[in-house]
């Protein structure tokens, strides 16, 4: 994705850039798919009601109004939420901790763990492989969509990870000799098992986080702080139930 060239040389928007939108609705970026479904009850408790088709997978719209005239929702791929927020396309968003670990955007502040979408980033290898291919090795071929996380993890074991960057069908990589192991997001593990793989290590446990653009928080502090508190209250309501 090519970042918009606004305000700074690296494409990140400055306070002056975001101030242009200061009278416009705040933009909340939400991920498509299972996280959006899990998020729906949280949104209800915050009092945020997006247009009905926002929660419909078949809808081709990407931007939606809400019950709050000062808040619009955009629906994007889960891996892209952090990019939209970091580059100022959205003021606030919901994304997995895996995305924050992978990209580590300095312009993102993550004030709340929403506790939904629980899963884990794991290393997996074929069940037929008796020994861990990483044992005693200084180099290892890894298929993943998380190159930063994978390199960091194996570097901690003094292993140089050679990355095969895939965005899907990760489980095929070891069986087709593209890689010795994979690093992927795992929920139940059923897809791994169905493809003859087994988990060997858990790198990190992952839940969804509320994230905020730091510049937007400075330029529209009252609005964004109020929105954060609505999410915080919604989580407290759930815990008290």
Curated annotation (Swiss-Prot):
Q: In which pathway does it act?
A: Amino-acid biosynthesis; L-histidine biosynthesis; L-histidine from 5-phospho-alpha-D-ribose 1-diphosphate: step 1/9
Function statement: Catalyzes the condensation of ATP and 5-phosphoribose 1-diphosphate to form N'-(5'-phosphoribosyl)-ATP (PR-ATP). Has a crucial role in the pathway because the rate of histidine biosynthesis seems to be controlled primarily by regulation of HisG enzymatic activity.
Q: How does it assemble?
A: Heteromultimer composed of HisG and HisZ subunits.
- The UniProt record lists the EC number as 2.4.2.17
Q: Which family does it belong to?
A: Belongs to the ATP phosphoribosyltransferase family. Short subfamily.
Q: What is known of its domains?
A: Lacks the C-terminal regulatory region which is replaced by HisZ.
Q: Which residues form a coiled coil?
A: none
Location in or out of the cell: Cytoplasm
- What is catalysed by this protein? 1-(5-phospho-beta-D-ribosyl)-ATP + diphosphate = 5-phospho-alpha-D-ribose 1-diphosphate + ATP
Q: Which GO terms describe its cellular component?
A: cytoplasm
**What is the protein's given name?**
ATP phosphoribosyltransferase
Report a single Gene Ontology molecular function: ATP binding
Q: Which UniProt keywords apply?
A: Amino-acid biosynthesis, ATP-binding, Cytoplasm, Glycosyltransferase, Histidine biosynthesis, Nucleotide-binding, Transferase
Q: Which Pfam families match?
A: HisG (PF01634)
Q: Which GO terms describe its biological process?
A: L-histidine biosynthetic process
